UniProtKB/Swiss-Prot annotation:
GO terms for molecular function: channel activity. InterPro entries: InfluenzaB_glycoprotein_NB (IPR007288). The keyword Ion transport applies. Belongs to the influenza viruses type B glycoprotein NB family. Dimer. It is a single-pass type III membrane protein. This is Glycoprotein NB. Residues 41-100 are intravirion. One of its GO terms (biological process) is proton transmembrane transport. It holds the Pfam family NB.
Length: 100
């Protein structure tokens, strides 16, 4: 049962290092592409949100880019208005219609 020993003297260290370098480069390239993809997505959402805010002067729903819609003196920002749910103030009628 002692025949299960391995002999590593014939392993070429240059090919081992070369393989490790190739794997490291591939993993690094993949990580860089993922990071740049996320950065490009953030800037694309910011650009679309800014264009929507400039074009439309009423309240917009800016899905996916809410952090960029919160600008000062921006009436169209979804965060500029506070919607109070009806279950918080059940006795208060906030509708614009007058009761009969």
């Amino acid at each position: 049962m002692n025949n299960a020993t391995f002999n590593y003297t014939n392993v070429n260290p240059i090919s081992h290092i070369r393989g490790s370098i190739i794997i490291t480069i591939c993993v690094s390239f993949t990580v860089i592409l993922i990071v740049f993809g996320h950065i490009a997505k953030i800037f694309t959402n910011k650009k679309n949100c800014t264009n929507n805010v400039i074009r439309v002067r009423e309240r917009i729903k800016c899905s996916g880019c809410e952090p960029f819609c919160n600008k000062r003196d921006d009436i169209s920002s979804p965060r500029a208005r506070v919607d109070i749910p009806s279950f918080i103030l059940p006795g208060l009628n906030l509708s614009e219609s007058t009761p009969n």
